[in-house]
């Protein structure tokens, strides 16, 4: 499994790579996954729908990532949105 970060102008950057069947490598993947979420990134697992259409499923924890996933892609949350309520 590869953990990748999308970086504008650079494409995909490999953050971590390992085999989830090897406990030490799985721990490293989990730690890297958590660091990205803690940094405010979103995580998505690419999938392929029937008919060949490419999609992605957002995940919020490493436990939600399918064991056979080849990669998880991290990307920044969209900026903006509703203004903060004034107090």
Give the ranges of each region predicted by the language model:
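Alpha-mannosidase-like glycoside hydrolase catalytic domains involved in N-glycan trimming
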Residues: 20-21, 46, 64
């Amino acid at each position: 499994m590869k953990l990748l970060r999308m970086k504008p102008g650079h494409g995909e950057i490999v953050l971590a790579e390992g085999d989830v069947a090897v406990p030490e490598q799985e721990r490293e993947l989990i730690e890297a996954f958590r660091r990205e979420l803690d940094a405010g990134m979103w995580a998505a697992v690419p999938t392929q729908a029937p008919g060949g259409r490419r999609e992605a499923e957002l995940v919020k924890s490493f436990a939600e990532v399918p064991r056979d996933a080849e990669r998880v892609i991290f990307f920044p949350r969209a900026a903006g949105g509703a203004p903060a309520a004034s107090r």
